[in-house]
């Protein structure tokens, strides 16, 4: 190409850029996804994806008209679907038994650090807090942290801004054996973050797992499952009184393990409950660059998840085992959970709470549907979520645990 042609091409590109920069873009005019075609078809790939998402009907959705027999059959379908999409492997070579790395006496409890070997080429860790003088065998709680948190935050070994989030430490002080894990990509499972002094990168590893047909949740729930199996083998733990407690991100592996393993006794769900498919459909308001929000990061992606269910369906399938939900959501979704427990014959086994800001019914959004075109903040407000007060609700959980674990 001659210099003249290169110069001409450069001028054209500059002119095009100038025209684009002079275009006035008003995000509020494009909050919802629309088409101007009379046949209702979309040219935009985003529009096509949204159309497909709206027309995706989960095959394992809970039906409030289930009979008790139908409910039991539905629970099996949910379990089969979870097993299918989590893709938990069966190692071809038997792995070594977990190994205790340390044992240290603390104020009122003993802290142990263990490592285990869930896969070839893989080692992971967990911590155990054993209250002094505890009667054995005793109930135990498997504690799963939220995003950016670690096992050491849960055990109180690393400083934490809100001490109520030191879930495992607080469980041990209450007299329960507590087992704490790291989520995949965080804590001991991090890459270079501790050296570089940066926040945890969940997305890169999640992308690699997805490329191999797995997922972040499939992997982290598989690791947690190995810890759960270890707990069942310990003489100090009552195998019929194991509780799973998840904070924020940790509620996702909690749901997976709860469905997979009917022997788990009870569940602490410390996050707001939502229809994740609906969240993706309604959060469409673009930013000033014309970028629409994605409802959650890549670590939350599980291929084919929405073909089967949404979060409330999964929690409903845990009935009749005791569950407490501590941070609200729409009353619509809580009502679905309560209905599932009614069908199971044990309505007393579910306890639900809203954020204090939305504790009064007249402060909550009573609607059963949400409008499209929402920003993230607008969505949170409409589903009765108070993000600044997202923390582990010890004041609600401890009395509940005492009640359900009382002999």
Feature annotation, model-predicted:
Residues 343-407:
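C-terminal catalytic histidine-bearing segment of alpha/beta-hydrolase fold enzymes
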Residues 84, 88-136:
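N-terminal cap/lid segment of alpha/beta-hydrolase-fold proteins
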Residues 210-211, 265-315, 320, 330, ...:
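Mobile cap/lid helix-loop segments that gate and shape the active-site cleft of serine hydrolases
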Residues 246-256:
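Glycine-rich nucleophile elbow surrounding the catalytic serine of serine-hydrolase chemistry
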Residues 136-137, 141-225, 232-233, 280-283:
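Cap/lid segment of the alpha/beta-hydrolase catalytic domain
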Residues 320-327, 351-352:
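Catalytic His-Asp charge-relay segment
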Residues 236-248:
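Alpha/beta-hydrolase fold nucleophile elbow
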Residues 22-83, 381-384, 392-394, 398-400:
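N-terminal pre-domain segments of enzymes
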């Amino acid at each position: 190409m001659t210099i003249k042609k290169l110069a001409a091409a450069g001028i054209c590109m500059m002119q095009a850029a100038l025209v684009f920069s002079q275009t006035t873009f008003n995000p509020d005019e494009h909050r919802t996804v629309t088409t101007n075609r009379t046949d209702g078809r979309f040219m935009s790939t985003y529009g096509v994806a949204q159309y497909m998402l709206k027309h995706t009907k989960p095959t394992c959705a809970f039906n409030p008209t289930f009979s008790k027999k139908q409910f039991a059959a539905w629970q099996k379908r949910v379990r089969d679907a979870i097993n299918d999409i989590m893709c938990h492997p069966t190692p071809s070579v038997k792995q070594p038994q977990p190994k205790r790395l340390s044992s240290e006496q603390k104020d009122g409890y003993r802290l142990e650090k263990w490592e285990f070997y869930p896969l070839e080429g893989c080692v992971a860790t967990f911590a155990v807090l054993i209250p002094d003088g505890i009667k054995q065998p005793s109930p135990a709680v498997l504690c799963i942290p939220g995003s950016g948190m670690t096992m050491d935050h849960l055990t109180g070994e690393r400083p934490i801004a809100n001490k109520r989030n030191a879930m495992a430490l607080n469980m041990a002080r209450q007299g329960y054996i507590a087992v704490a894990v790291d989520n995949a990509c965080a804590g001991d499972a991090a890459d270079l973050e501790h050296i570089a002094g940066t926040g945890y990168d969940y997305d890169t590893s999640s992308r690699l797992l997805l490329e191999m047909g797995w997922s972040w949740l499939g992997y982290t729930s598989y690791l947690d499952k190995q810890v759960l199996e270890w707990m069942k083998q310990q003489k100090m733990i009552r195998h019929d009184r194991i509780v799973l407690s998840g904070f924020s991100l940790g509620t996702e592996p909690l749901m997976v393990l709860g469905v997979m393993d009917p022997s788990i006794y009870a569940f602490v769900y410390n996050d707001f409950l939502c229809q994740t498919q609906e969240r993706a459909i309604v959060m469409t308001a673009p930013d000033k660059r014309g970028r629409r929000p994605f409802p959650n990061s890549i670590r939350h992606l599980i291929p084919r998840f929405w073909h089967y269910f949404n979060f409330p369906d999964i929690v409903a399938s845990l009935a009749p085992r005791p569950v407490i939900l501590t941070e609200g959501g729409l009353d619509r979704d809580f009502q679905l959970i309560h209905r599932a427990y009614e069908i199971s014959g044990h309505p007393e086994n579910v306890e639900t709470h809203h954020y204090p800001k939305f504790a009064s019914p007249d402060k909550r959004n009573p609607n059963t549907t949400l409008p499209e075109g929402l920003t993230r903040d607008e969505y949170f407000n409409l589903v009765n979520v108070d993000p600044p007060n997202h923390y582990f609700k010890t004041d609600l959980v401890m009395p509940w645990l005492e009640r359900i674990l009382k002999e």
